[in-house]
């Protein structure tokens, strides 16, 4: 029987919690899976590597996008698939792949679903599966309290998003596949491997995590009113027509900022930097998805 491991972000929960997970796994013949609980998502890679060393052939990841990102960064390039148990707030990757926020159903997908090979983005040496960037999104992620997210869910992002709208734009130069693509001031740079952000807003309509390219968006909104317009255009599916948004696609993205800014990968904030070096890593990770998932 396949050796199964479970890596858990302690404190995160959904459905019947870990008790339900243990029950579902036991009923499927996995009464004693390799079991690891970590207090911080940054501790997850060590647990993942230990699980693989102990023979795990399938790794369940219990947590949100940040937890999944840490585990993916540790498992990339291996043949060991990840099964997502979406216990976070946003769960962007799980949602985009059709993985439900239901313990029994998500576990069933891990045990008996299809194995889909996905691309990953690599930003400053770290891999991400959903979204990464700097500016508005990074400020919002950095300023949202984890306890508030647990209590309020997506509503917790509202306060920090209002603050992010007031942040000053920064001058930058962006190269896309080696050519200068953007030069000027911008308030947000977003790089997507999938198309939808928190709140269900579609940013990149044609994005796919298996097309060998990353989608790039730059927002030049200068104040809260312009940000309201940007979000309205996204909600109406008209972001491609916006004069406040520029979009592109490619395999390599190089962002140089005039001033240091924090950045984020899959909802996890990272230290301030003046340089973002990004590339696509095609077919780098295997994820368990529903058998009806689109190719």
Positions of the model-derived regions?
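ATP/nucleoside-binding phosphotransfer catalytic cores, i.e., glycine-rich phosphate-binding loops
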Residues: 176-178, 208, 218-295
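ATP/NTP phosphate-donor binding region
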Residues: 1-59, 69, 294
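Catalytic core of DAGKc-family lipid kinases
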Residues: 5, 27-28, 38, 76-81, ...
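Glycine-rich beta-strand-to-loop/alpha-helix junction loops that act as flexible
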Residues: 10, 62-64, 85-87, 193
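Glycine-rich phosphate/pyrophosphate-binding beta-alpha loops
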Residues: 133, 137, 190-204, 269
């Amino acid at each position: 029987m396949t050796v199964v491991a479970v890596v858990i972000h302690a404190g995160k929960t959904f459905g019947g919690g870990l008790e339900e997970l243990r029950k579902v796994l036991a009923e499927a013949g996995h009464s004693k899976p390799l079991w690891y609980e970590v207090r911080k998502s940054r501790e997850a890679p060590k647990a993942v590597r230990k699980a693989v060393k102990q023979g795990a052939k399938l790794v369940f990841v219990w947590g949100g996008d940040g937890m999944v990102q840490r585990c993916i960064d540790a498992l990339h390039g291996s043949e060991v698939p990840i099964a997502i148990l979406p216990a976070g707030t946003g769960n962007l990757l799980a949602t985009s792949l059709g993985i439900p926020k239901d313990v029994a159903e998500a576990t069933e997908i891990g045990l008996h679903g299809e194995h889909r090979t996905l691309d990953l983005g690599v930003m400053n040496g770290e891999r991400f599966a959903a979204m990464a960037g700097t500016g508005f999104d990074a400020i919002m992620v950095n300023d949202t309290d984890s306890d508030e997210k647990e209590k309020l869910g997506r509503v917790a992002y509202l306060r920090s998003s209002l603050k992010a709208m007031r942040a000053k734009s920064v001058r930058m130069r962006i190269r896309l596949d080696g050519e200068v693509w953007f030069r000027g001031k911008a308030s947000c740079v977003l790089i997507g491997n999938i198309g939808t952000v928190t709140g269900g807003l579609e940013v990149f309509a044609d994005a796919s995590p298996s097309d060998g390219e990353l989608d790039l968006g730059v927002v030049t909104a200068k104040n809260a009113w312009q940000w309201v317009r940007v979000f309205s255009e996204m909600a109406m599916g008209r972001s491609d027509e916006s004069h406040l948004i520029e979009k592109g696609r490619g395999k390599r993205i190089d962002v140089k900022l005039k001033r240091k800014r924090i950045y984020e990968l899959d909802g996890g904030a990272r230290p301030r930097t003046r340089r973002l070096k990004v590339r696509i890593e095609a077919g780098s990770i295997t994820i368990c998805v529903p058998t009806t998932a689109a190719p």
